[in-house]
């Protein structure tokens, strides 16, 4: 059972540590959310840098504490940038976040996501359809991935329907999985928590 008071204290402690250390978390993200992602990182006390080139992604991993990889807008150069950044983080033992936006749109996106499996992200964040498709694509839960069910950034599944897929992903990566929605699901593969701080706009 989750101790909600202890959880709150842990969140406060984490925020205080971020503000005290001002960690660098690089981002390779889509063009739609560049400003929002950078400002969110700055708002909690971190330091942000948004890059595109392969060597820049690797450099940010080397000099920073983590990296965020959002697959929403894929440029041809990302075929090198994204896997190299993920590999650099994995090899350095640094956490990285995978946001598999639009999984199922085009062969490049699908192949990149398959390649990223070996680097085990510390956090996976996606809507219900993306999480279900990712677990299927990685062969972790249920039948083979039905990528036709993923409609860009929109979900065709409920958060609760993604529960088993989220747990399977978290157990494989050894990290955490967040299924976004009006009520968000968060799991480490053992414990499942529901957060009522989400938004229907995140579905």
Tell where the protein language model's regions lie, with residue ranges:
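Short, basic, glycine/proline-bearing loop/turn elements
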Residues: 23, 40-43, 67-72, 95-101, ...
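Hydrophobic transmembrane alpha-helix bundles
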Residues: 66, 88-96, 132-144
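Glycine/small-residue-rich loop that forms an oxyanion/phosphate-binding "nest" at active or ligand-binding sites
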Residues: 70, 78-127
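Conserved phosphate/ATP/ADP-binding segment of small-molecule kinases
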Residues: 107-192
